[in-house]
C-alpha cells in the first residue's frame, strides 16, 4: 500500500489484514511508513507497539557488521518472530473458519539517507522485507510511504501486487501516478488504484496511474471515532468495507 501521506493507506492496510485473518489466513503486517501508525490503526495501544527496527542499533550492528565486516546480505530468518507482536482481530472470524494470526513488525522509515548508520539500517530493513516476501508462504502486507524504496528489484519479483491509494485531488493523484510509474520501472505491473473518500465524479486518466480503479466513500463511522479512538476496525460500515476489500483482492488476482 503506497501513496501520498494522509490518504488512508494505513486504514486500507489495517482493514485488509483484518479481513484476511478473519477468513483464516496468517498475515504479516509491515509498518514501513514514517508515521508508524499501522499498529494503532489495528487496535493496539501505544504501549504495546514494538520498537521500530530502524531504531534497533544493536541489531543493525550485529547483523550488518558481523565479524567486523560490512554485510549487505545479512541472515535475518529469525528476526520476524523476534520483532513481531500479535495483533487481535477487529471482529468475529468467518463462521466455520479458524481465524488466522495477525503479526505486526514496525520497521519505520530511514530518514537520513546520507548517514552511514541510516544506510546500514536500510540494508537490514530491506533484508527482512525480502525474507518475508520471498521465503514465507503467508500473506505479507506492507504499509509504505509515497514510494517503493524499501522494495529492491529482486524483492519486487516476488510481490503479488501494489495498491496505490489516493484522495480525490489532483495533487494526491499525481503522487499516485508517480508511485505507479516507479513501481512499473521495477517490474511491478500488477497495480490497483483505490481512490479513498470519493464522493463522485470520474477519476482522471493520468499517465502512470494504475488502470484498474476502486473507490471508497467517506465513512461517517470512522469520522466520528477518530478524535477518541485510533483504531479503524469494527466500524458501523464494516460489512461495506469488507465488500470493497474483496473486490480489491479479486482485482489483484488473489
Each model region followed by its residue ranges:
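Hydrophobic positions on the alpha1 helix immediately C-terminal to the Walker A/P-loop
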Residues: 12
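Conserved lysine of the Walker
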Residues: 9
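Inter-motif core of Ras-like GTPase G domains
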Residues: 127-136, 150-170
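C-terminal lobe/tail of nucleotide-utilizing enzymes
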Residues: 182-254
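Switch II (G3) loop of P-loop NTPases
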Residues: 107-113, 117-118, 129-151
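Hydrophobic anchor at the beta1->P-loop junction of P-loop NTPases
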Residues: 1
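N-terminal phosphate/diphosphate-binding loop that engages ATP/GTP or pyrophosphate donors
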Residues: 19-98
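Walker A (P-loop) phosphate-binding loop of P-loop NTPases
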Residues: 5-6
Amino acid at each position: 500500500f503506497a501513496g501520498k501521506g494522509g490518504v488512508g493507506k494505513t486504514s486500507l492496510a489495517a482493514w485488509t489484514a483484518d479481513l484476511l485473518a478473519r477468513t483464516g489466513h496468517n498475515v504479516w503486517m509491515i509498518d514501513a511508513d514514517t508515521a508508524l501508525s499501522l499498529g494503532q490503526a489495528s487496535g493496539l495501544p501505544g504501549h504495546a507497539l514494538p520498537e521500530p527496527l530502524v531504531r534497533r542499533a544493536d541489531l543493525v550492528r550485529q547483523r550488518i557488521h558481523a565479524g567486523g565486516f560490512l554485510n549487505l546480505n545479512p541472515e535475518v530468518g529469525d528476526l520476524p518472530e523476534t520483532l513481531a507482536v500479535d495483533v487481535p482481530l477487529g471482529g468475529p472470524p468467518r463462521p466455520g473458519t479458524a481465524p488466522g494470526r495477525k503479526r505486526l513488525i514496525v520497521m519505520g522509515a530511514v530518514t537520513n539517507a546520507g548517514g552511514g548508520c541510516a544506510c546500514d539500517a536500510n540494508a537490514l530493513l530491506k533484508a527482512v522485507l525480502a525474507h518475508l516476501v520471498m521465503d514465507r508462504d503467508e500473506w505479507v502486507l506492507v504499509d509504505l510511504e509515497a514510494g517503493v524504496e524499501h522494495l529492491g528489484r529482486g524483492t519486487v519479483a516476488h510481490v503479488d501486487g501494489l495498491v496505490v491509494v489516493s484522495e480525490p485531488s489532483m495533487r494526491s493523484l499525481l503522487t499516485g501516478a508517480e508511485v505507479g510509474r516507479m513501481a512499473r520501472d521495477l517490474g511491478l505491473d500488477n497495480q490497483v488504484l483505490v481512490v479513498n473518500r470519493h464522493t463522485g465524479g470520474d477519476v482522471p486518466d493520468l499517465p502512470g496511474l494504475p488502470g484498474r480503479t476502486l473507490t471508497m466513500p467517506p465513512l461517517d463511522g470512522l469520522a466520528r471515532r477518530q478524535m477518541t479512538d485510533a483504531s479503524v476496525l469494527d466500524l458501523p460500515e464494516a460489512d461495506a468495507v469488507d465488500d470493497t476489500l474483496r473486490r480489491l483482492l479479486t482485482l489483484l488476482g488473489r
